Amino acid sequence: MTVAAILLAAGHGTRMNSKTQKVLHGVGGKPMILHVFEAAESVADLPPVVVVGAGEEGVRALLGERATYVVQEQRLGTGHATLMAEDVLRGRADQVLVTYGDMPLLRAGSLAKLVAEQRQSSAVIALLSVLGDAGSSFGRVVRAADGAVSEIVEVAEARQRANTAELLAIRELNAGVYCFEAGWLWDNLPRLPLRQAR
């Protein structure tokens, strides 16, 4: 089974109020994206695909020819960003890891376990989740009675539902790291609604 990895790095990181692109800020002595890239590179069978946007020069200068680059011209959400990699990956990989480029604490071992879990299960998607505080801004992982993930509910959406308190009390949070069965991913990504980035 061939594994590909996509790192989403097209965002501006405007909340950081910096001229430096968010993924290029240093953590632990090196740029955030380099931590994630090296973890993905150790698990992937192909050079990781990095989705870039405006200000891509710094990312390209840092990663050089170790990465394959695709450009997301319009910021229309993470599903759309992932879709930008279809032309370079469709038919080349059996599994596709997708993660954000600003996750410096993500470890290669965690990615390897996620890939193995998706491969061994009958699920088309496997995701990493974390246990956190009820006050977190991360999406909540909602599970059915049998333990299967039924949905991921973002905080803004949870606040508009009748069971807001119940949803926001969930401590299992979506880490934003996924492993997909490749064919399923490419067949279903176009069905996602486009969302203008915040």
Identify the residue ranges that each predicted region occupies.
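Conserved beta-strand scaffold positions in the cores of enzyme catalytic domains, especially
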Residues: 24, 69, 125-127
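Conserved N-terminal catalytic core of the sugar/cofactor nucleotidyltransferase
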Residues: 1-4, 26, 30-120
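Short glycine-enriched loop/turn motifs at secondary-structure junctions
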Residues: 17-19, 99, 169-173
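Conserved core of the sugar-phosphate nucleotidyltransferase
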Residues: 57, 65, 106-197
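Short beta-strand/turn micro-motifs composed of small residues
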Residues: 9, 52, 100, 129-130
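Short glycine-enriched, charge-decorated loop/helix-capping segments at active-site entrances
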Residues: 20-24, 192-195
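N-terminal nucleotide-binding beta1-loop-alpha1 segment
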Residues: 1-18
